[in-house]
Amino acid sequence: MRLEVEARLRLGSFAIDAAFGSEGGVTALFGRSGSGKTSLVNIIAGLLRPDQGRVVLDGDTIADSERRLFTPVHRRRFAYVFQEARLFPHLSVRGNLAYGRWFAGAARSGPEFGRIVEMLGIGHLLDRMPSKLSGGERQRVAIGRALLAFPRLLLMDEPLAALDDARKAEILPYLERLRDETRIPIVYVSHSVAEVARLAERVVVMENGRVKASGKTAAVLNEPFPTSGPGRREAGALIEGIVDSHDEGHELTVVRAGDCLIRVPHLVAEPGQRLRLYIAARDVMLATRRPEGISALNVLPGTIVGLSSPRQGSIDVRVDCGGNVIAARVTTLSRDALDLRPGKQVHAVVKTVALDY
């Protein structure tokens, strides 16, 4: 199901001038706070009316300024999950879910109720009130309510932003199931590279109200020396792998990525499950000999395949570690002291706790 968006809108001194297309699955709108992500998703939802532009979903024109066509919010059949769950405090979990069913009609949503409740792991919460739920539980209920409205498009505006790290880790597996088990296209707003890497098939990078880059997630996030991707501070590498095993005693998960085994904090995932990890360049150290007696658990042998130009006294070094290219940010002093150059054998050192998301 293809989504096409073109929008121009002035909001005081800030202007949106953006266009993108996606082919279903999860499309992430990524960028720093104030980049225009939420304004753009609100245009898609119909909460903001653009000065110029159009929104087309699967060939159906939802809005078109040239034709003076603007479908009201309640007729778009789009569902919106906000940063805060926004559950009705006077209704139980079951009552909140029933509100979503009301939009679709009880007969239509009846067979799906049990499947969605099971997929989101909220069956044991049905009789609780929102005040008795954790932040992660409230968001899962909000997602369930949205799904039970049978939307044509699901919009999610930073659904994990208000959660602490533990609650984020709790809810991410459910978002992966949502992505994998439903055919509903999703526009997912986030400023977290790790979330985007783990969930999205495509990413649209926003900056100052404009689209700075767009494409498949791996291509955008793995841009060798980013000038148009996620930005230098967030630069790194997306690694695809499978869950190899769990170390329950130490609450770790071992991920096999190419020829490498990478230890990460415990993930709720079955052995053999495919997943993606994002390793930020600023979290990687390089050593010319395998270091001993260090706390970092991931020491990955590899070969340097590229170095960026110096910027503010540092460079990004790309290292091929068993078929996966990892980026490391080091100072120019370290480059000279270690004689870092293409073809040199090194070890990339990554702290396990740096991969905690």
Curated annotation (Swiss-Prot):
Domain ABC transporter: residue ranges: 1-233
Annotated Mop domain residues: 293-357
E.C. number: 7.3.2.5
Cellular component per GO, a single term: plasma membrane
Keyword Ligase carried by entry: no
Topology with respect to the bilayer: Peripheral membrane protein
Principal subcellular localisation of the protein: membrane
Matching SMART domains: AAA
Keywords noted in UniProt: ATP-binding, Cell inner membrane, Cell membrane, Membrane, Molybdenum, Nucleotide-binding, Translocase, Transport
Subcellular localization: Cell inner membrane
UniProt catalytic activity: molybdate(out) + ATP + H2O = molybdate(in) + ADP + phosphate + H(+)
Residues binding ATP, per UniProt: G31, R32, S33, G34, S35, G36, K37, T38
Gene Ontology MF annotations: ABC-type molybdate transporter activity; ATP binding; ATP hydrolysis activity
Pfam families documented for this protein: ABC_tran, TOBE
Oligomeric form and interacting partners: The complex is composed of two ATP-binding proteins (ModC), two transmembrane proteins (ModB) and a solute-binding protein (ModA).
Similarity-based family: Belongs to the ABC transporter superfamily. Molybdate importer (TC 3.A.1.8) family.
Purpose: Part of the ABC transporter complex ModABC involved in molybdenum import. Responsible for energy coupling to the transport system.
Protein name, per record: Molybdenum import ATP-binding protein ModC
Organism: Rhizobium meliloti (strain 1021) (Ensifer meliloti)
